[in-house]
């Protein structure tokens, strides 16, 4: 079997592949898209980093392709949807850069506390200046960690070794996780107000974009030191620049930026109290070796019929089972995403119940698909079918799975319930319809609905009164948003009603505010499946 190594991975990883019986390894670093297309015609696996783009066209040109392995975390350079349609496994290596990124974060923190780079530059210029580079100690200072996932947890351990008090903000942080790491779980506002140092370790999503902005810097201590080795855009760069120039923020360390590469004329380059690195989070010999060997081992496992590990588009199952389970995996992932977006941030339990035919299948992969769907928008790390249960456990969320023997109105039904610490339940259920196994949402929060499980949804709870359908249609029409599908539900006339509207495009912020502000609308959620 032929493996194309399209980007340079560690020599140890390539050597491992070459040692496997029956494997032919082709190294083609820096190839043009046209060259890649010509090379993939007879390959069974492709190994990449971030340079080579594995597009739909590339996947279509590779009829024998079984697996794409990404030596690293992000898979933005791989068309995962096209790969999934073809039954091609896409894998990443999420754990290989944890220590490297945590240590780089701490390097930035130390350089922010003691201006070593600036002092070194002064020495290199021939000076002997002992007065300009006074710093502060980490000992007994307060560190605020925004995002207590895998990397944030490692940073917390190192900070405690330096004698720091550690605060953590993570909207999905369970008290048990905070206790295990011996950190104080606080709100974001409390963290910003109390911290001497802040480091961010969140994914970049709609919710985390600019989560630290002008308002944050107004609330922070004078002399704050702040660091970002996660994703550009979590800290608003214009706000940080202003805070650095005013002296409100004493120092910053940045490894990631809103736009990369960082512009040559960026104002950050001119500030003496900023240390910049060019996205080096995973750039250690050990991390590169780790992800290179890990991706090589994972590719070999797939080609040799072994376990599928760290798949981003399917669970650890064999290819034959994927064909049967595929529609259920898709439905489960979408139901998980739906419930996450209608439920509060912190939950204590996730209950998954299967009725009918689906309960006769191997439900473990489906359960993992549901968990991944729930986590993928909110986790501070890449979520796949392997690590989703681990992340739930780390968050302190109990997952209960039940195969029900009671009767259901459907041949098969999958229901997900998110239970909050105070016992509130937020739920959705779905089934597969027709010969093509089309996924449908049939219940939301106990109300009967019927809408395709795809695309963009408005989930509305409103007073049951005349004109509501027209009102919503008018608002969306003004916003040039087309309605693709709609389902209405109520328990009785005049009670609270549910309206689920599937739309072709995302409503503007103005339209959303108008909907949420309508007197008859009790709850309005915009959901992306």
Language-model regions, residue ranges each:
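An N-terminal-biased, well-structured beta-alpha scaffold segment characteristic
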Residues: 1-91, 213-215
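Short beta->alpha connector loops at strand-helix junctions that form conserved
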Residues: 28-29, 49, 71-72, 87-99, ...
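Rossmann-like adenosine-cofactor binding region
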Residues: 52-59, 171-267
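Phosphate-coordination loops involved in phosphoryl transfer and adenosine-cofactor binding
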Residues: 65, 139-142, 214, 223
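Phosphate-binding beta-alpha-beta segment of Rossmann-like dinucleotide-binding domains, i.e.
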Residues: 86, 94-142, 146, 150, ...
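Rossmann-like dinucleotide-binding domain for NAD(H)/NADP(H)
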Residues: 86, 90-91, 214, 223-342, ...
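NAD(P)-dependent dehydrogenase/reductase Rossmann-like domain
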Residues: 283-529
């Amino acid at each position: 079997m032929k493996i194309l190594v399209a980007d340079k991975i560690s020599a140890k990883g390539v050597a491992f592949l070459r040692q496997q019986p029956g494997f032919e390894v082709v190294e083609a670093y820096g190839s043009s898209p046209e060259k890649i297309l010509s090379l993939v015609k007879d390959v069974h696996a492709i190994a990449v980093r971030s340079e080579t783009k594995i597009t739909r066209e590339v996947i279509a040109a590779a009829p024998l392709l079984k697996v794409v392995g990404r030596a690293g975390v992000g898979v933005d350079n791989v068309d995962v949807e096209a790969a999934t349609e073809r039954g091609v496994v896409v894998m990443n290596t999420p754990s290989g850069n944890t220590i490297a990124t945590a240590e780089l974060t701490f390097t930035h923190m130390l350089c922010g506390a003691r201006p070593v780079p600036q002092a070194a530059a002064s020495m290199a210029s021939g000076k002997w200046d002992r007065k300009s580079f006074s710093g502060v100690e980490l000992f007994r200072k307060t560190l605020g960690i925004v995002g207590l996932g895998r990397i944030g947890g490692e940073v917390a351990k190192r900070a405690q070794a330096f004698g720091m008090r550690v605060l953590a903000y993570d909207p999905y942080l369970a008290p048990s996780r905070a206790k295990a790491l011996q950190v104080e779980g606080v709100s974001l506002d409390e963290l910003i107000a109390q911290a001497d140092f802040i480091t961010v370790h969140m994914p970049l999503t709609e919710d985390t974009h600019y989560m630290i902005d002008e308002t944050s810097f107004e609330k922070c201590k004078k002399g704050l030191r702040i660091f970002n080795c996660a994703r550009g855009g979590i800290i608003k760069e214009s706000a940080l620049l202003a805070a650095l120039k005013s002296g409100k923020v004493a120092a910053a360390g940045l490894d990631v930026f809103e736009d990369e590469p960082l512009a040559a004329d960026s104002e950050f380059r001119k500030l003496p109290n900023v240390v910049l690195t060019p996205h080096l989070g995973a750039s250690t010999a050990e991390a590169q070796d780790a992800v290179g060997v890990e991706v090589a081992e994972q590719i070999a496992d797939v080609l040799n019929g072994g376990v599928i590990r760290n798949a981003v588009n399917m669970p650890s199952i064999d290819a034959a089972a994927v064909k049967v389970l595929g529609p259920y995996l898709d439905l489960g992932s979408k139901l998980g995403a739906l419930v996450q977006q209608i439920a509060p941030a912190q939950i204590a339990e996730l209950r998954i119940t299967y009725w009918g035919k689906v309960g006769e299948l191997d439900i473990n992969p489906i359960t993992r698909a549901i968990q991944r769907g729930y986590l993928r928008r909110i986790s501070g790390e890449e979520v796949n079918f392997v690590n989703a249960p681990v992340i739930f456990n780390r968050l302190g969320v109990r997952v209960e799975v039940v195969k029900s023997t009671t009767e259901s109105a459907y041949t098969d039904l999958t229901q997900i319930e998110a239970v909050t610490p105070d016992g509130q339940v937020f739920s959705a259920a779905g089934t597969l319809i027709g010969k093509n196994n089309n996924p449908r949402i049939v219940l939301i929060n106990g109300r009967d609905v019927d809408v395709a499980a795809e695309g963009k949804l408005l989930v509305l709870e409103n007073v049951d009164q005349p004109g509501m359908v027209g009102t919503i249609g008018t608002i969306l029409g003004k916003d040039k948003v087309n309605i693709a599908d709609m389902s209405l539900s109520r328990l009785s006339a005049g009670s609270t009603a549910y309206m689920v509207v599937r739309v072709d495009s995302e409503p503007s912020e103005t339209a959303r505010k108008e909907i949420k502000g309508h007197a008859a609308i009790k709850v309005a959620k915009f959901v992306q499946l």
